[in-house]
Amino acid sequence: MNDPYPLETLDENVIDAAIDSRIREHLTRCFPDSPDKFREHRIWHNLSPEYTVLVRRQAGGANGRDLIIGHVAVVIRTITTTWNWRYNAASIQGVSVAEDFRHTGLAVQMIDRALDEARRRGYLYAVLFCKEPFVPFYENLGWRLTDDSVVMWNEQDSPITMRSNCPMYRELTDKPFPEGPVDVHNPEQVGMKKNGNRESDEVK
């Protein structure tokens, strides 16, 4: 039997204006406390996704249109460790399922797909920031809270105040997550390419 709601993995460069509009409508419905955040674009701390995992419900009728019912975006961040090693990591953003389709396992399927794709692209780690009530959900999926501080920085090298203040990580290979405090940057801010250079040499 065919999956009634198949998952799609879309690179940002194939998401046209129509799909982008539907995604933003979905995000606005799922995050009503941020009504203006997705009005014009899908950007998380000044970065667009590298790819997005979607679930769409096919609309019936000649004039119908597909409805986005599930979404996970993956933005590429650079994490810098105490020892000044830098890694590009897959940052999970906008995990959301339309209200009528929650508690069906779609969120878990989308996150798994997003991590599989990050692994396929060569990333060593995935990171996310979530609110405290969601920590048990992610822990059940193998995510871990960091033992040390994680600070995200903006383009002016000022720390960003995070509304979702529980940093978590997943190891995508057998390489352990770096120990000690971690800084999170826009890749270009610290001289890393968004696409490629999954692991850099030590920065002197």
Model-based region annotation:
Residues 98, 131:
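Residue-level recognition of the GNAT/N-acetyltransferase active site
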Residues 116-130:
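Conserved GNAT acetyl-CoA-binding A-motif
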Residues 2-3, 10-15, 30, 119, ...:
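Terminal substrate-recognition subdomain of acyl/acetyltransferases
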Residues 9-96:
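A conserved beta-strand-loop-helix scaffold within acyl/acetyltransferase catalytic domains
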Residues 57-61, 100-101, 171-176:
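Short loop segments at secondary-structure junctions
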Residues 74, 114, 134:
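Conserved alpha-helical elements of the SDR catalytic core
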Residues 97, 103-116:
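Conserved acetyl-CoA-binding loop-helix of GNAT-fold acetyltransferases
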